[in-house]
UniProtKB/Swiss-Prot annotation:
Family: Belongs to the sirtuin family. Class I subfamily.
Cofactor entry: Zn(2+)
Reactions listed under catalytic activity: N(6)-acetyl-L-lysyl-[protein] + NAD(+) + H2O = 2''-O-acetyl-ADP-D-ribose + nicotinamide + L-lysyl-[protein]
Composition skew (Basic and acidic residues), residue ranges: 397-406
Organism: Candida albicans (strain SC5314 / ATCC MYA-2876) (Yeast)
Binding site for NAD(+): 40-59, 129-132, 261-263, 291-293, 312
Superkingdom per UniProt: Eukaryota
Pfam families: SIR2
Keywords from the named record: Cytoplasm, Metal-binding, NAD, Nucleus, Repressor, Transcription, Transcription regulation, Transferase, Zinc
Extent of Polar residues compositional bias: 448-459
Protein name (Swiss-Prot/TrEMBL): NAD-dependent histone deacetylase HST3
Cofactor stoichiometry and binding remark: Binds 1 zinc ion per subunit.
Name of encoding gene: HST3
Class of the enzyme per the UniProt entry, highest EC level: transferase
BP term (GO), one: regulation of phenotypic switching
Lineage per the UniProt record: Eukaryota, Fungi, Dikarya, Ascomycota, Saccharomycotina
């Protein structure tokens, strides 16, 4: 458990080590997406509700009305006070004073922080030990209605709750006999301020019906109305609903738990913190404790990661400074972005105006002459006094005649003329005997046409004699590489 003491560093510069640790806490809160919050009486001290033990506290106010009563502060929240009429009367007066103070209480920075987490969809659930119901002033839904859980699906009704009151609701009255719930009214408030408990109207109606019908009245009692809160040593009337709801939240696997304004001394709250811490650490989350008093390091070192010793509201104000976007609504964020875009656009469109140079009068120059000089020549005036200017050389630019040339067209593929096929002369070795005989056969009809008709009639001996020299000639020509087509 890392301890960060902000009370010792108030008004002074924060040490580097403390600043680094605090930055880790702030960074984790800003990145968390599914948070659970546990609150105690410490977050309501700045709401206008008097504390219990100071000179103007509620205990002294009650003693002023009941000077003979000897009741300790802890006894006002114990179930044993119902055994004594004097203790019960003190209890009624104390609760009426606390109820009146809660009506005039204003939400603190811590209450508003819980509301912001809800609006940003970062809040899974807020569990509170407080019974003052200040959260309802900022439109956070709280209070367990038994009829709603009986008539509808459990998970649907449970997920509609923003704040779960672990120790009851001061703004409701419940019957000690039938457990029916009632709202406060002027009659009930007057009776309780005087130390008297109002009677339950439902129990009274049931009693009268049995009385008028002539039925037995044995065991029929009329209950008394008292604030719907859980006292020490008393069984919680909504324990089944709370247990089922807490198990549902554990299955949702939150990634952060912030504990604010409680000393963690109640057994049930200790068990809740340890169960949530185990689930959160398995997911890689962190548990952050914020209160004015320190915890026992040996008891909580395995469950709490960061301990911030500070006033709860001061811690929230510091978060506002470090992560301001978390505390802005979506409309405010959108308008801020539009303003930034507008400022950037105006700065881009704004013309750049150069400042006019002032003419400085050098010694030896009259004021009238100085006025004739333009601001652009301010620098040249100084140069003329001390530095000789080089003569300006005019360079003539030769005129260059440019010939107009036709715009080149994209080249086309040139036409390649077909080359005549060259006859390849065969060597004598390449000519076979079959080619020689085939050529001889083709020449025979040509020789027949050239010969006279008489010779063809006279006989074939002369033809054979004539064919023989022709064959020889062809064979000789073939050896030399000469074909008949070339003749």
């Amino acid at each position: 458990m890392i301890s960060i003491d902000l009370l010792d560093n108030s008004g002074t510069s924060m040490p580097a080590d403390t600043s680094i640790k605090l930055h880790e806490v702030i960074k984790f809160i800003s990145k968390s997406k599914k948070m659970t919050v546990l609150t105690g009486a410490g977050i309501s001290c700045n709401a206008g509700i008097p504390d219990f033990r100071s000179s103007d506290g509620l205990y002294n106010m009650v003693k002023a009305k009941h000077p003979k009563a000897v009741v300790r502060g802890q006894d006002l929240f114990d179930i044993s006070l119902f055994r004594d009429e004097m203790s019960l009367s003190v209890f009624c007066t104390f609760m009426e004073s606390l109820y009146k103070s809660s009506l005039n209480a204003k939400p603190t920075e811590t209450h508003k922080f819980i509301k912001i987490l809800k609006d940003k969809n970062k809040l899974l659930r807020c569990y509170t030990q407080n019974i003052d119901c200040i959260e309802q002033h900022i439109n956070l839904k709280l209070g367990i209605n038994l009829q709603e859980f009986d008539n509808n699906k459990f998970k649907q009704v449970w997920n509609q709750l923003d704040v779960v009151q672990l120790h009851g609701n001061l703004h409701k009255l419940s019957c000690t006999n039938c457990f029916s719930q009632f709202n406060w009214n002027e009659e009930f408030q007057t009776l309780l301020a005087n130390g008297l408990n109002p009677e339950c109207s439902k129990c009274m109606d049931k009693y009268q019906q049995r009385l008028y019908s002539g039925k037995r009245l044995t065991g029929q009692t009329i209950g008394l109305l008292r604030p719907d809160i859980v006292l020490y040593g008393e069984h919680h009337p909504q324990m089944e609903i709370l247990t089922q709801g807490l198990n549902s939240d554990l299955k949702s696997r939150p990634d952060c738990l912030i504990i604010m304004g409680t000393s963690l001394k109640v057994a049930g709250v200790k068990s809740l913190v340890k169960s949530l811490s185990k689930i959160i650490h398995n997911k890689g989350g962190k548990v952050i404790y914020v209160n004015k008093t320190k915890l026992s390091a040996s008891s909580w070192k395995n469950y709490i990661d960061y301990e911030v010793v500070s006033d709860c509201d001061e811690f929230v104000r510091m978060l506002k400074t470090e992560i301001p976007d978390l505390f802005l609504t979506q409309e405010q964020l959108d308008s801020e972005k539009l303003n930034q875009v507008a400022v950037k656009g105006s700065s881009l469109n704004k013309p750049i105006v150069k400042p006019e140079a002032k003419v400085k009068i050098e010694p030896g120059i009259k004021q009238e002459d100085a006025i004739q000089y333009s601001p652009e020549r301010e620098v040249t005036i100084k140069q003329e006094v001390n530095i000789k200017q080089e003569p300006i050389v005019k360079r003539e630019v030769e005129s260059v005649s440019v010939k107009e040339e036709p715009i080149p067209t994209p080249p086309t593929t040139p036409h390649k003329p077909k080359q005549a096929t060259k006859l390849k002369r065969k060597s004598p070795d390449e000519i076979s005997a079959n080619e020689v005989h085939s050529r001889v056969k083709r020449l025979r009809p040509r020789n027949d046409q050239l010969s006279s008709p008489a010779s063809s009639i006279n006989g074939s001996e002369e033809e054979e004699e004539e064919d023989e020299p022709v064959a020889k000639v062809l064979f000789e020509n073939a050896r030399k590489g000469i074909t008949l087509d070339q003749h």
